[in-house]
């Protein structure tokens, strides 16, 4: 203990990052997972509990720089929340406290989805009006693909039929020539998975654009023809493109062989995201939609969930780095209102950091940063000893593998 205290004092006097190093070495995977689950539930509960109780529209606040998007904000919150929490729910219930918590939220989510697609429910959501509903029908579809047993499998036949009807309503919306093309693709992928048929034109168009025209190199896609330095490769492009191709390959659809290339690109992009995490557990505040908070790490979490991290990245270092980010991002009570709803911001209540298309519902994309909770507690991601992430090692004077482009 004396040596630890002396190390901390020496670090404070010299500026050396002793405290972050000690943090990385002292935290167990079990403790990290508890932090993730606690934060996940805190974020998701207001959305899922109110939707299950048919009080979402009544209770969910509306905050935005634009006054005219409230009617779409509910599906935004629902689709994004389910997209992020689905892998964790897919583990199913068990006798552990966490397993019982999953049971609770599986039941709430299944009931909530049934309400969201029921025209007689006060929480019936809009899927077929241009243009925003396409985005969040897509996130809902991706969530269903991520939990086929616990969510889709537990819906009643009538609710499944109505989900299909509502997803098909989004076909009237023409996507922009940007990441939006993948929203149409993922909706069709879900329809293919759950009904055995889809609109192959809408399915394939986005895949071909990103594969043939919009790849810029070293795992970076343009958001359309142009490249933008933001996190949309993580918010949308890599995760949705990968999930679409997984469905295409499963159903032996033409052009699904691109999945092998895409998985390598996802792994490389995940490696880049891991290197964005500073020794202190922060990351660059750059690009639009930065108020999606931990949604920045959607692609990194997906690569971990699918065991697609590059060989030189130890899963535990991703766990430790992301845990520190989660703690930093949600430490301030200013992230939430008095009823637990997310406020627009980055690490607090900071609405001026947002764009006009952002509203309360939009911010729940942060939950896509929690995908590794879909790995069981005995997976090496959670069970391995703590490991320092790249920047923590590099700034502590330790050896780090050279970084190579794809």
Label the model's feature ranges:
Residues 74, 85-88, 102-263, 275-301, ...:
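Aromatic-lined, polymer-binding surfaces characteristic
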Residues 83, 87-93, 404:
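Beta-sandwich/jelly-roll carbohydrate-recognition scaffolds of carbohydrate-active enzymes
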Residues 1-27:
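Bacterial Sec-dependent N-terminal signal peptides
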Residues 257-355, 381-397:
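Non-catalytic carbohydrate-binding regions of carbohydrate-active enzymes
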Residues 25-77, 83, 87, 107-114:
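Low-complexity, Ser/Thr/Pro/Gly-enriched N-terminal "stalk/linker" regions
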Residues 97-98:
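Long, charge-dense tracts
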Residues 49-66, 117-122, 325-406:
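CBM-like carbohydrate-recognition segments
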């Amino acid at each position: 203990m004396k040596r630890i205290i002396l190390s901390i004092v020496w670090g404070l006097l010299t500026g050396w990052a002793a405290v972050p190093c000690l943090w990385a070495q002292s935290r167990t995977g079990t403790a990290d997972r508890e932090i993730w689950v606690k934060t996940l539930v805190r974020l998701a509960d207001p959305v899922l509990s109110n939707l299950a109780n048919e009080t979402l529209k009544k209770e969910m606040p509306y905050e935005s720089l634009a006054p005219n998007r409230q009617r779409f904000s509910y599906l935004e919150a629902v689709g994004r929340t389910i997209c992020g929490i689905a892998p964790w729910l897919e583990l199913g219930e068990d006798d552990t406290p966490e397993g019982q918590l999953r049971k609770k939220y599986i039941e709430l989510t299944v009931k909530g989805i049934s309400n969201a697609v029921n025209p007689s429910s006060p929480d019936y959501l809009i899927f077929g009006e241009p243009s925003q509903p396409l985005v969040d029908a897509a996130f809902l579809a991706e969530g269903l693909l991520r939990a086929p047993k616990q969510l889709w499998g537990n819906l009643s036949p009538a609710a499944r039929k109505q989900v299909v009807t509502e997803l098909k309503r989004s076909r009237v919306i023409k996507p922009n020539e940007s990441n939006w093309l993948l929203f149409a693709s993922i909706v069709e992928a879900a329809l293919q998975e759950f009904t055995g048929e889809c609109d192959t034109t809408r399915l394939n168009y986005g895949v071909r654009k990103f594969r043939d025209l919009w790849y810029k190199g070293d795992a970076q896609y343009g958001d359309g023809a142009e490249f933008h330095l933001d996190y949309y490769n993580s918010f949308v492009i890599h995760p949705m493109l990968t999930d679409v191709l997984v469905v295409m390959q499963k159903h032996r659809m033409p052009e699904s062989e691109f999945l092998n290339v895409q998985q390598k690109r996802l792994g490389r992009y995940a490696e880049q995201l891991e290197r964005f995490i500073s020794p202190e557990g922060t990351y660059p505040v750059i690009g639009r939609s930065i108020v999606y908070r931990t949604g920045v790490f959607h692609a990194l979490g997906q690569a971990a969930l699918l065991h697609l991290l590059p060989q030189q990245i130890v899963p535990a270092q991703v766990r430790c780095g992301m845990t520190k980010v989660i703690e930093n991002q949600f430490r301030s009570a200013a992230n939430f209102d008095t009823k637990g709803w997310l406020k627009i911001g980055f690490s607090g209540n900071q609405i001026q950091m947002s764009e006009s298309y952002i509203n309360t519902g939009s911010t729940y994309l942060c939950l896509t940063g929690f995908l590794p909770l879909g790995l069981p507690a005995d997976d090496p991601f959670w069970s391995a000893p703590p490991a320092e992430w790249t920047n923590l090692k590099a700034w502590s004077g330790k050896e780090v593998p050279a970084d190579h482009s794809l």
